[in-house]
């Protein structure tokens, strides 16, 4: 739904280096949903991890979905450190029945090293329970193999996933995708990386 507004094509820059974001207007997004709705599509995935970071963009979209009465079944991504209780009722009313959370790791030091937010201020279990309180299902995303990981920290991640027991869970092997901070860390440390883009898949 939004596009990273790069102001440089420097290969040594990663996504966090670019502050600007170009957004489609709420009207444009709603008109696209209208097209899908007329085709009989009821289930939508908002595959945009940044969608819920800016209220002035997502609130008009969700309110528009409610006003137009689409009766959708949607799922969306959210960062574990940006979930806000005052918005969850709106999410549910608009038809967001699933939130996929980037929980990533069970160990706090590993989470802090990921550079995705102030995880130290977040009680993951409370966030999951809060979302579920609004009858929204949680999909937990976990990753194994961060640079700070070892067998003990990866066991913590598995234990956290088992304890949270979310409605669904995905487990991934960490990959240093081109443009990510981990990619540049790997290059700097001369870690072996795939030679072709398709090999990152």
Where do the language-model regions lie?
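Radical SAM [4Fe-4S] cluster-binding motif and immediate context
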Residues: 1-139, 146, 159
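Flexible glycine/acidic-rich beta-alpha junction loops that bind and position SAM and/or redox cofactors
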Residues: 4-5, 56, 109, 114, ...
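Short alpha-helix in the alpha/beta-hydrolase fold that links the catalytic acid
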Residues: 153-157
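Basic phosphate/pyrophosphate-binding loop/patch that engages nucleotide-derived ligands
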Residues: 159-168
